[in-house]
A protein has these predicted regions:
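N-terminal active-site segment of His-dependent metallophosphoesterases
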Residues: 68-128, 202, 209, 229-230
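Residue-level marker for buried hydrophobic side chains located in beta-strands
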Residues: 81-83, 109-111, 143-144, 221, ...
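Short, solvent-exposed aromatic-acidic interface loops
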Residues: 325-334
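Extended active-site neighborhood of metal-dependent phosphoesterases/phosphodiesterases
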Residues: 103, 117-218, 233-234, 238-248, ...
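N-terminal export and membrane-targeting signals
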Residues: 1-10
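C-terminal region of N-terminal signal peptides and the immediate post-cleavage residues
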Residues: 15-47, 53, 64, 89
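N-terminal low-complexity, Pro/Thr/Ser-rich intrinsically disordered segments
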Residues: 47-80
Length: 342
């Protein structure tokens, strides 16, 4: 398949087509500082020289070339999360490039699964993940279990390597508060090791109880397989019970990997309908180092997509919202903006 080297972003001013080069599209005027947006929305803010476009939820298939700018620490001292999924293999170097980004950026590190290819073995964690992202184990607090991570002894090497960043109380789903946010790690390997994702499964029962007990205004959940995706794996209906539980309590943000690309969706309900009032924003960040893959389709409500750049997502967890910025390793692509919690 030929990889597309163009950008198509439907912005507030109309459809913009860019073939190569940089693009700047003036979006709606921010209402509350750079990158601010209306409550519940999630719109990338354009700024002079940034190459970052403001896009509407109706954006069509495309890639947005841009000039990445390294994020700066939050001046307010709000917690920062940094991460991606689909990270390390010994015959590649792109994971070392994304690790170099982590080295220059302060914050808590998370992974979105498929951390050490091909099989999550002890040797692969030591020899492939270790020299790159493994240098930041002391900063790594949230580790998602991907399907490749279960290939060896049902994930035992990963549990031993990451400890309670990956497994707590004997399971691969857990939560904790970070600043004003409730952060949840889930296991989306629904068909492996028995049913894990059904509405009456122990994991989803735990999730509903955990959400009911939380007093945080803002909620973020992360797991490996995306419910919605334009990528090679497409939509995963098996994780729909996660979305049902999260949407019912007004959760705000979901992070996934699995597809080897970057994609951001407008807020949606569990059925994939646009919902600017109560919808959840999903980001797929499978750009940690494994070879990138072309998109298979144009999923509804997908507003930014790139399969051309490895990188990490930086999230600034503010008391009533979040700032986000995708930082690529080669400076070829960036996506940034702000969302407001429900």
């Amino acid at each position: 398949m030929v990889r597309l080297g163009l950008a198509v972003i439907l912005a507030a001013v109309g459809t913009v087509l860019v073939v190569g080069g940089l693009m700047n599209v003036a979006g709606p005027a921010p209402s509350d500082g750079p990158g601010a947006s209306a409550p519940g929305s999630d719109v990338a803010a354009a700024s002079p020289g940034s190459g970052v476009a403001a896009a509407s939820p109706a954006a069509t298939r495309g890639v947005e070339p841009a000039t990445a700018r390294a994020p700066t620490p939050s001046p307010s001292g709000d917690p920062v999360l940094l991460g991606a999924g689909d990270i390390a293999r010994c015959d590649g170097t792109d994971d070392e490039a994304t690790a170099a980004l982590l080295e220059g950026l302060p914050g808590i590190v998370f992974t979105l699964g498929d951390n050490a290819y091909e099989d999550g073995s002890t040797a692969e964690l030591r020899d492939c993940y270790g020299p790159s992202w493994g240098r930041f184990l002391d900063r790594t607090r949230f580790v998602v279990t991907g399907n490749h991570d279960l290939h060896t002894d049902d994930g035992a090497p990963e549990a031993a390597y990451f400890g309670d960043a990956a497994v707590r109380d004997g399971v691969t789903w857990f939560s904790e508060d970070v600043g004003a946010w409730h952060v949840i790690v889930l296991d989306g390997n629904c068909g492996l090791l028995g049913g894990r994702c059904g509405a009456d499964s122990p994991q989803v029962r735990w999730l509903r109880d955990d959400l009911a007990a939380s007093t945080a205004r803002c909620t973020l959940a992360m797991w490996h397989q995306p419910r919605f995706s334009s990528g090679q794996h497409g939509n995963d209906r098996a994780v729909a019970p996660f979305w049902d539980a999260l949407y019912a309590v007004g959760a705000d943000l979901v992070l996934n990997g699995h597809d080897h690309d970057y994609e951001r969706f407008a807020p949606q309900d569990p059925d994939g309908n646009a919902d600017g009032a109560r919808g959840i924003t999903e980001m797929v960040v499978g750009t940690g180092g494994i070879g990138l893959e072309d998109f298979e389709t144009s999923a509804a409500n997908s507003i930014v997509r790139s399969s051309l750049a490895h990188g990490v997502i930086e999230l600034t967890l503010q008391p009533s919202g979040w700032g986000f910025r995708f930082v690529s390793t080669d400076g070829s692509f960036s996506d940034q903006g702000h969302g407001t919690c429900h």
